[in-house]
């Protein structure tokens, strides 16, 4: 099975409602599509969103990285060189993790098709069903309470609540959400780097003193402030999950070795795909650090790849893969089924992707 063409396109998917965090407001998912075509007729699919405020990637950067650097390293090569192919993706250029992730997942999709096995089985997985949380955007407290009630009515029993735009309002925001949903719903919060270390400890301890019962806080301080992360981890009465602080396997090791967080968030767009995500999961298994699998604002294909990993690794105990259910449309044929909080991975070879609704992808060729 030789790679004969790397085809690129763009796809736009409106969100049900605007997505608001401490970093940005987004109205639609804008993804780059990757198709790896082979001499057998098999096609491997990948996808990447430009998330400039986190990964630094833009649509043009993703397309350029793949066209000018990654594709030339793959064309004409056989999938039997799989380890060399995934290494070539990572070595083609520095950074550009979203572009690398899109191509890496497409290679895994092809590998599954080559051996007539779903990706999650090839990774050693046995479970087909996982349950995700859903994100509540940061807004005025009463609006967040309303959104939280709606999510619970849709069947969600775990909410990821965005905070951080105005730290002085964050306690009121979470209090409104907790009052709206009751005590049986899990609440995890994400500050998206918005606080400093002392501010984070003060706010988190206030939340706990009010009995708001937070499962964990995600990335309370700036990504580069590992000392600040350590301070929050040691002094706040809430477990800390490292997100933007962890891009590479080396980053994950540093977090685990220094005790800068209690948990680690794996995102394919940060680490460069399934291959590096497996390395992060392996390190977490050694250190006994539980992981969450998360996503950017992504549509179905790239989140599908994360689902394959989540179904394979028991160290991934927390699921934050709500991207497809935040979208108002599904342009992808086949693959995992996203039924509100319930996600079922496909048992078809590879990722089970069969293509796109006609006319939805704007190809570059």
Report the location of each language-model feature.
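Metal- or metallocofactor-binding catalytic centers and their adjacent structured scaffolds
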Residues: 5-7, 37-114
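Active-site beta->alpha loop and helix N-cap motifs at the rims of alpha/beta catalytic domains
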Residues: 136-144, 167, 171
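Flexible C-terminal active-site loop/helix
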Residues: 4-15, 29-31, 296-365
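Structured beta-strand/loop patches that form or line metal/cofactor-binding pockets in enzymes
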Residues: 1-40, 45-54, 327-329
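Conserved, mostly hydrophobic/aromatic
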Residues: 3, 34, 41, 70, ...
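N-terminal small/glycine-rich loop or linker at the start of catalytic domains
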Residues: 113-137
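Glycine-rich phosphate/pyrophosphate-binding beta-alpha loops
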Residues: 48-56, 135-139, 295
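Catalytic core of soluble alpha/beta enzymes
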Residues: 161, 167-302, 329-331, 336-338
